[in-house]
Design a protein with these regions (language model features):
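Acidic, Mg2+-coordinating phosphoryl-transfer loop and its flanking beta/alpha structural elements
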Residues: 139-142, 146
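Conserved N-terminal glycine/acidic-rich loop preference
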Residues: 90-130, 152-176
Length: 176
């Protein structure tokens, strides 16, 4: 079974408090990827709460973002219809809320080992790499691919470095 994981394509990461020109530039690529994908599509959603500034992440990245229920927390409008088109027993509406860099319930969500995963989204050097490595840990023999043309890092340099780390862990990187 093929699974496309769209990582954190939320307003705050695209054109909000942590948005970048690179993140804005990948939106059309991600939309085309989603439209043409044959398989199941899941979205991760970075989720913080009003106490964000008191968390470890808030102390190290003192920019409030993706606060639950805010506009910045929302999946971008270009992808929202694709994100909210399913319901299953584990994931509500195809969106997996995560409260740290990586989603930690992969094994509960995908109980079998017969999956191929493809990831894209933001930020390559934080949440994309964290989720790719978590998938590698839970599914050591799975084909895991990251589409570089559908990812953006905090900076272009960090994007490139994260791609190299993923390659080192037998994650296929395409469209560099």
């Amino acid at each position: 079974m093929k699974v496309l994981v769209i990582v954190d394509m939320q307003k705050d990461f695209i054109d909000g408090s942590l948005g970048t020109p690179e993140a804005q530039a990948i939106v059309p690529n991600v939309v085309e990827k989603v439209k043409g994908f044959e398989g199941d599509i899941y979205f991760t959603r970075d989720t913080h709460f009003d106490d964000y500034m008191n968390t470890l992440e808030g102390k190290n990245l003192p920019v409030p973002h993706c606060i639950n229920g805010t506009e910045g927390w929302s999946i971008i409008k270009e992808l929202n219809d694709y994100a909210c088109n399913r319901t299953d027993e584990v994931v509500s509406k195809g969106i997996m809320d995560k409260f740290t860099f990586g989603y930690k319930d992969w094994r509960q969500t995908f109980r079998l080992d017969e999956f191929e995963f493809e990831l894209c989204g933001v930020c390559t050097d934080i949440c994309v790499v964290s989720n790719a490595l978590a998938l590698r840990m839970f599914y050591p023999d799975a084909l895991i691919t990251v589409d570089a043309s559908c990812c953006a890092g905090v900076t272009p340099e960090k994007h490139a470095a994260a791609l190299e780390v993923m390659k080192s862990c037998q994650i296929d990187v395409i469209n560099e």
